[in-house]
């Protein structure tokens, strides 16, 4: 039986470009979606990968059938984006510092506990 691949999406194609390239090249991982507000840059990048769906809206991106999300968006937005992704049923990796306040840290920990999803930084 073939091993199920981990389906990954990347949010933020500037700094996330490297993560997307690595995901696409890894055995056992499938790059399935990317999200960025810079539509042309995102579509140009996605054209290199067959079957990758592009989104400009984070909410719609999270509706995509994927197991995990790599957050490569603005560092100040990682905690809210991570919490939203976990509530949408996705595991999360932040490529940068996750929180800017203790309140965000507490909210992030609570989201991990409530959802049972894996969060990596």
What does each of the following model-derived ranges do?
Residues 1-49:
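N-terminal Rossmann-like dinucleotide-binding module
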Residues 25, 47, 63, 110-113:
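Solvent-exposed polar/charged
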Residues 27-28, 88, 113-117:
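Short helix-capping segments at alpha-helix termini
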Residues 33, 68, 118:
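Short, Asp-centered acidic motifs that coordinate Mg2+ and/or phosphate
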Residues 107-121:
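Rossmann-fold dehydrogenase core element
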């Amino acid at each position: 039986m073939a091993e199920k691949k981990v389906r990954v999406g990347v949010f933020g194609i500037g700094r996330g470009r490297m993560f997307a390239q690595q995901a696409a090249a890894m055995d056992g991982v499938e790059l399935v979606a990317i999200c960025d507000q810079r539509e042309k840059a995102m579509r140009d990048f996605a054209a290199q990968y067959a079957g990758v769906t592009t989104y400009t809206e984070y909410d719609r991106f999270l509706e995509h059938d994927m197991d995990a999300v790599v957050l490569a968006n603005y560092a100040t937005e990682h905690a809210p984006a991570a919490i939203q992704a976990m509530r949408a049923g996705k595991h999360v990796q932040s490529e940068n510092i996750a929180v800017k306040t203790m309140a965000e840290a507490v909210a992030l920990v609570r989201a991990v506990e409530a959802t049972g999803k894996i969060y990596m930084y």
